[in-house]
Every structure is written in C-alpha cells, then in structure tokens.
Design a protein with these regions (language model features):
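Solvent-exposed alpha-helices and their adjacent loops that cap or buttress functional pockets
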Residues: 31-32, 102-105, 129-130, 162-166
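Conserved beta-strand and immediately adjacent loop positions that scaffold enzyme active sites
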Residues: 36-38, 109, 135
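Conserved beta-strand scaffold positions in the cores of enzyme catalytic domains, especially
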Residues: 110, 136, 169-171
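Active-site and channel-lining beta-strand-loop segments
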Residues: 28-51
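Conserved PLP-anchoring active-site segment centered on the Schiff-base-forming lysine
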Residues: 128-147
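Active-site-adjacent loop/helix segments that line or gate small-molecule/cofactor pockets in enzymes
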Residues: 1-35, 74-76, 95
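PLP-dependent aminotransferase-class I/II
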Residues: 34, 143-171
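Glycine-rich loop-to-alpha-helix module at the N-terminal edge of alpha/beta enzyme cores
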Residues: 2, 46-133
Length: 171
C-alpha cells in the first residue's frame, strides 16, 4: 500500500462520518478511476463493480452519451428545488406516464425524488396517509435504504443495529 493510499485512509478515519457504512474489505479499498463496469485502484487493477453504486449507475461508468446529456443540462439548469418547474422535469414526467399507461394500462403521475431511501420514506407516508393504517409490512432480507423510516422496515441487523428496534412500526 503506497503512502498516498495510507494518507487517504487516515483522513477517512479522521474526517469522515461512517454512519452505517459497511466496508467490504479491511482496510477499505481506495479506487482512483472507473470505466464501464470496472473500478480501478492505485495500481490500475480492475475490479468488477457488482454494486454499480446501488444500481443507480447500471449504465456503466464514463458513459459518453449520458455524460454529454448531463453536462448540457448542468450548463443550462443544474438543479432546482422540487417546488419549481422547468420544461425538462415536465417532459420527463410525461414520457414516464405515457410509457406506464401504454405498458400497464395505468394512468398516473410522477413524483421525483433524490434516491431510493427517500422514495421508501415517501411511500410509507403515502400509504399511511391514504389508508390511515400505522403498520406496514416489509420483505425479510429486503434492503429498503438507510434513512430512519426505511431502517424501521428492514430485517437487516446490519442497518438496524445502531438505531434500535422498530418492531412496533413494521411487521
């Protein structure tokens, strides 16, 4: 392990909050580059990324087509809070809704969110609000995210261990 990697690991231990992060190697692997489905360490050794950032980037790293579109959007209008409208948001919602109606025969609307755990949180709220019920079920062994609400419905000890038991809220 070279000095640069040692310094990164030391800074990680000193400055980064680990929360409920689980490292799959001890010491954790430090990656410096990526392409396609691979991550590369300081020696340019390729590692097949089975997680692909929790499936959020299953299009592959350094996808030129996607990078070009993202760069164009960042230059134009990088991000807006959800209460503001912009054409791209509405156009994407239309595409998704039309696809869902065509494929499944279901009309609906789109709720944009920042990630999977937040989507689980919002789903819990929608179900609770719509049904008035306070108990919900979740699948054994399922991963639902790391927010407090999502942790409440996971059976995984790894994600619940630091936050206590929420069995009164999920079955």
């Amino acid at each position: 392990m070279n000095q640069k990697i040692i310094e990164i690991l030391e800074k990680n231990n000193r400055y980064c909050s680990h929360g409920d992060t689980v490292n799959y190697a001890d010491p954790p692997k430090v990656f410096e580059d990526c392409e396609g489905s691979f991550l590369f360490d300081e020696n340019n050794t390729p590692y097949l990324d089975w997680q692909m950032w929790y499936s959020a980037v299953n299009f592959g790293y350094k996808n030129k087509r996607l990078s070009d579109v993202l760069h164009k959007q960042v230059d134009k209008l990088p991000q807006l809070a959800s209460q503001y409208l912009h054409k791209e948001k509405v156009d994407l919602a239309e595409i998704i809704c039309k696809y869902m109606e065509e494929k499944y025969g279901v009309k609906g609307r789109v709720h944009f969110n920042v990630g999977g755990a937040q989507a689980v949180e919002d789903s819990l709220k929608v179900v609770r609000n719509h049904t008035g019920k306070t108990h919900q079920f979740a699948f054994m062994g399922g991963y639902h995210g790391r927010t407090l609400g999502a942790s409440a419905i996971t059976s995984s000890y790894r994600y619940r261990r630091r936050f206590g038991n929420f069995s009164d809220r999920a079955h």
